[in-house]
Amino acid sequence: MNVILLDKIANLGNLGDQVSVKAGYARNFLLPQGKAVVANAENVKVFEARRAELEAKLAADLAAAADRAEKIAALEAVVIASKAGDEGKLFGSVGTRDIADAVTAAGVELAKAEVRLPLGALRTTGDFEVEVQLHTEVKSVVKVTVVAE
């Protein structure tokens, strides 16, 4: 299925690219989220008319994400308290939601989907550097300190 991208999508393309994707990916992800439209003659004309508006929106989103990244980088270590055993092993774990809530409480809005924990949830006390991806092109690192309650 050929679609026109309305946003930059990792490993697929940039705004305005006509790409061929599997029908299920287009129907279930790209089209419902407004990230693409079906590539037919009418939609190509509509897209070309809206191209400047979409590029301006994309630039504004990128600038907002860069601003949030600076605020996150400027934060001191975010402290999360959790119940832990004697050797510093947590009885539960600290996941993406806990980190996002702690950063939001510190004053910078952060969604749990933006937090990247490639090795899984944090299961011990200590200091960690957690990557947050605010935009496809903007990443930042937040310092998280997990302490025992």
Curated annotation (Swiss-Prot):
Q: Name one GO biological process term.
A: translation
**Presence of the UniProt keyword RNA-binding in the record:** yes
- Molecular function in Gene Ontology: rRNA binding; structural constituent of ribosome
Question: What PROSITE patterns would the database entry show?
Answer: RIBOSOMAL_L9
Gene3D superfamilies given for it? Ribosomal protein L9, C-terminal domain (3.10.430.100), Ribosomal protein L9, N-terminal domain (3.40.5.10)
Q: Which domain of life is it from?
A: Bacteria
* Keywords on record: Ribonucleoprotein, Ribosomal protein, RNA-binding, rRNA-binding
> Is GTP-binding there in the keyword field?
no
GO CC terms in record: ribonucleoprotein complex; ribosome
InterPro entries reported for this sequence:
Ribosomal_bL9, Ribosomal_bL9/RNase_H1_N, Ribosomal_bL9_bac/chp, Ribosomal_bL9_C, Ribosomal_bL9_C_sf, Ribosomal_bL9_N, Ribosomal_bL9_N_sf
The text of the family note is: Belongs to the bacterial ribosomal protein bL9 family.
What is the annotated role of this protein in its UniProt record?
Binds to the 23S rRNA.
Name of protein: Large ribosomal subunit protein bL9
